[in-house]
Amino acid sequence: MANKILVVDDEPNIVLSLEFLMKQAGFQVRTASDGEAALAAVTADTPDLVLLDVMMPRKNGYEVCQAIRANPDWKAVRIIMLTAKGREVEREKGLALGADDYITKPFSTQEVVERVRELLAEAG
């Protein structure tokens, strides 16, 4: 059975691009366009991994990451933050809140696929 990926970003072009990329890599993909929708999606059908933008309406990525990590039922969910905020302080904040990885935009599509595969392999 294919791993489930949730793509969360408020930019439709990025969502479409990542959705296509993840499906081509063999993953099941769902999408959300804001933080509230992301948490609703995680609640409805817990993914194996979340590709999570930081700057979004209705809860930012940091808040979503924190909410996922606060719920023991979602402990196994892997989180990769994808963001234009590339300063070290933002990266440290994301990792401190429980993100497993942090990739800055613009990103290499192959790098995203490889990091997703690596995290899922580590998770077992």
Please describe what each predicted stretch is:
Residues M56:
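Receiver (REC) domain active-site loop signature in two-component systems and cognate sites
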Residues F107-R117:
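C-terminal output helix
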Residues T31-L49:
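Acidic, metal-coordinating helix/loop segments flanking the phosphotransfer/catalytic sites
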Residues P12-R30, L119:
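Two-component/phosphorelay signaling modules centered on CheY-like receiver
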